[in-house]
Amino acid sequence: MIKILFICHGNICRSPMAEFIMKKMVSERGLADRFHIESAATSSEEIWNGVGNPVYPPAARKLAEHGISCSGHHARRLERSDYDRFDLLIGMESYNIRNMMRILGKDPAKKVCKLLDFAGGGDISDPWYTDDFDTAYRQIEQGCAALLEHFSAEKNIYS
């Protein structure tokens, strides 16, 4: 089983969008049983009294436009123990990577990367600040498709 953790600042926009887009992609290809996919935050800003906030409503609406439900999701913070639990820890932008490394400490197995590293590089724009959920969705979808293609080539997930 391939275990993926998508990470952004608050775990209410980009990383849950990536989580649920990727879940849909693997499900549509009959691969859901070969993947375990979650998301987390580098910050605890969206977690109050131990309970994480749900997906930010505009992000949830953007997912719903594409037939993707994110119900039941609540923000959670990245923990050092996640490094051992997941095969890949995927940030959305360079700042996420910096903050992930502050939490994780080190990356000896080279598990930490950005989503768009699989699609030519770059950062996923943060719709929390830009209010551009269309661009964020497109970038995340492109990155997830490239990630799935990477696993298809590297791990022969279809056999």
Residue spans for each PLM region:
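Phosphate-binding/catalytic loops
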Residues: 82, 88, 94-159
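Conserved active-site segments centered on acidic
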Residues: 1-84, 149-159
